[in-house]
């Protein structure tokens, strides 16, 4: 991937970049069977805003971006509808998204009374703790954890994925992507461990929640959830760091860094050691897309 002087960089120099880069979680991408139904559900039940929508007839798909704030500052959900496909397999590996709210009971009642989503876990304290949570399921089967919290600039607060080796995954996200381990919690009574990773405090930004279930090393991925996009100041340097870490911990570069045809947005993509896809997007190019 690198050439000339770049090829001579020591691993230490390459791995310094993720520590000083200004990365940000941009959006999660997944597929839905009825785009208008999902937009209606998320806006009416969860209180999200439809941020933008684009139809690409030559490639037979439509995208919609939803969230609680503008994409230049907030995380978004990118929904993809592929013409004629009304059902997907979510698989066992994807866990949930999470929404922070000041009143879980009130939000759950709103969902019950006027929504195509359904409450699958009634509001109440989390097992073994005091945080009030509930779970809702959207029409495609995606789960949303509702978490009671004070006011936050980012209500869309988690993407939860299951992994087969938590320590390996933590090391990968720290070294390759410069994330911070914000919290780690073992729950032996229920045989799982979680780790929260991100670029700022949990109550201020979106984080990746990685879950390890005791003894489970592999999960089915299905074809519904696609990827998370992360903004970076330099796609080339970021991809170089990722490629180096994949040699140590596993994973795979899928797309070498470079501009997308037509858009000219510079991206790179890769799989983490568990096969979860991540796309790196140039921060400046992403902001141009939003104009």
UniProtKB/Swiss-Prot annotation:
<comment type="pathway">
    <text>Secondary metabolite metabolism; methylglyoxal degradation; (R)-lactate from methylglyoxal: step 1/2.</text>
</comment>
<feature type="binding site">
    <location>
        <position position="209"/>
    </location>
    <ligand>
        <name>Ni(2+)</name>
    </ligand>
</feature>
<feature type="active site">
    <location>
        <position position="96"/>
    </location>
</feature>
<feature type="binding site">
    <location>
        <position position="145"/>
    </location>
    <ligand>
        <name>Ni(2+)</name>
    </ligand>
</feature>
<feature type="active site" description="Proton donor/acceptor">
    <location>
        <position position="145"/>
    </location>
</feature>
<feature type="active site">
    <location>
        <position position="209"/>
    </location>
</feature>
<feature type="binding site">
    <location>
        <position position="96"/>
    </location>
    <ligand>
        <name>substrate</name>
    </ligand>
</feature>
<dbReference type="GO" id="GO:0005737">
    <property type="term" value="C:cytoplasm"/>
</dbReference>
<comment type="function">
    <text>Catalyzes the conversion of hemimercaptal, formed from methylglyoxal and glutathione, to S-lactoylglutathione. Involved in the detoxifiation of methylglyoxal. Can functionally complement growth defect of a yeast mutant lacking GLY I. Involved in abiotic stress response. Over-expression of GLYI-11 in tobacco increases tolerance to osmotic, oxidative and salt stresses.</text>
</comment>
<keyword id="KW-0533">Nickel</keyword>
<comment type="similarity">
    <text>Belongs to the glyoxalase I family.</text>
</comment>
<dbReference type="GO" id="GO:0006970">
    <property type="term" value="P:response to osmotic stress"/>
</dbReference>
<dbReference type="GO" id="GO:0009651">
    <property type="term" value="P:response to salt stress"/>
</dbReference>
<comment type="subunit">
    <text>Monomer.</text>
</comment>
<feature type="domain" description="VOC 1">
    <location>
        <begin position="24"/>
        <end position="149"/>
    </location>
</feature>
<protein>
    <recommendedName>
        <fullName>Lactoylglutathione lyase</fullName>
        <ecNumber>4.4.1.5</ecNumber>
    </recommendedName>
</protein>
<dbReference type="GO" id="GO:0019243">
    <property type="term" value="P:methylglyoxal catabolic process to D-lactate via S-lactoyl-glutathione"/>
</dbReference>
<keyword id="KW-0677">Repeat</keyword>
<keyword id="KW-0020">Allergen</keyword>
<feature type="domain" description="VOC 2">
    <location>
        <begin position="155"/>
        <end position="283"/>
    </location>
</feature>
<dbReference type="GO" id="GO:0006979">
    <property type="term" value="P:response to oxidative stress"/>
</dbReference>
<dbReference type="InterPro" id="IPR004360">
    <property type="entry name" value="Glyas_Fos-R_dOase_dom"/>
</dbReference>
<feature type="binding site">
    <location>
        <position position="31"/>
    </location>
    <ligand>
        <name>substrate</name>
    </ligand>
</feature>
<keyword id="KW-0456">Lyase</keyword>
<dbReference type="Pfam" id="PF00903">
    <property type="entry name" value="Glyoxalase"/>
</dbReference>
<keyword id="KW-0597">Phosphoprotein</keyword>
<dbReference type="GO" id="GO:0016151">
    <property type="term" value="F:nickel cation binding"/>
</dbReference>
<dbReference type="GO" id="GO:0004462">
    <property type="term" value="F:lactoylglutathione lyase activity"/>
</dbReference>
<dbReference type="InterPro" id="IPR004361">
    <property type="entry name" value="Glyoxalase_1"/>
</dbReference>
<feature type="binding site">
    <location>
        <position position="82"/>
    </location>
    <ligand>
        <name>substrate</name>
    </ligand>
</feature>
<dbReference type="GO" id="GO:0019863">
    <property type="term" value="F:IgE binding"/>
</dbReference>
<dbReference type="InterPro" id="IPR018146">
    <property type="entry name" value="Glyoxalase_1_CS"/>
</dbReference>
<dbReference type="InterPro" id="IPR037523">
    <property type="entry name" value="VOC"/>
</dbReference>
<keyword id="KW-0479">Metal-binding</keyword>
<dbReference type="InterPro" id="IPR029068">
    <property type="entry name" value="Glyas_Bleomycin-R_OHBP_Dase"/>
</dbReference>
<feature type="active site">
    <location>
        <position position="158"/>
    </location>
</feature>
């Amino acid at each position: 991937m690198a050439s000339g002087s770049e090829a001579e960089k020591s691993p230490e120099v390459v791995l310094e970049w993720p520590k000083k880069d200004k990365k940000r979680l941009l959006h999660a991408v997944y597929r839905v069977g009825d785009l208008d139904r999902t937009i209606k559900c998320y806006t009416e039940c969860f209180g999200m805003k439809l941020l933008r929508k684009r139809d690409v007839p030559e490639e037979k798909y439509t995208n919609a971006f939803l969230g609680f704030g503008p994409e230049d500052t907030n995380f978004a959900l990118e929904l993809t509808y592929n013409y004629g496909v009304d059902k997907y397999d979510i698989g066992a590996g994807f866990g949930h998204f999470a929404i922070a709210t000041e009143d879980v009971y009130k939000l759950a009642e709103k969902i019950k009374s006027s929504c195509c989503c359904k409450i699958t876990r009634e509001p109440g304290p989390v097992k073994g703790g005091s945080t009030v949570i509930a779970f809702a399921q959207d029409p495609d089967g995606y789960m949303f954890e509702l978490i009671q919290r004070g006011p936050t600039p980012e209500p869309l607060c988690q993407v939860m994925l299951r992994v087969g080796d938590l320590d390996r995954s933590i090391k990968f996200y720290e070294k390759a992507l410069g994330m911070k381990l914000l919290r780690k919690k073992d729950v032996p009574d229920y045989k799982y461990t979680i780790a929260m990773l991100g670029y700022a405090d949990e109550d201020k930004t979106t984080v990746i929640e990685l879950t390890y279930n005791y003894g489970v090393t592999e999960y089915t991925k299905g074809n519904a959830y696609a990827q998370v996009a992360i903004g970076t100041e330099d796609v080339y340097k970021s991809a170089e760091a990722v490629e180096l870490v994949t040699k140590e911990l596993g994973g795979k570069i899928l797309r070498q860094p470079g501009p997308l045809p037509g858009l000219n947005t510079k991206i790179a993509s890769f799989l983490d050691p568990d096969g979860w896809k991540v796309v790196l997007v140039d921060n400046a190019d992403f902001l141009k897309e939003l104009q």
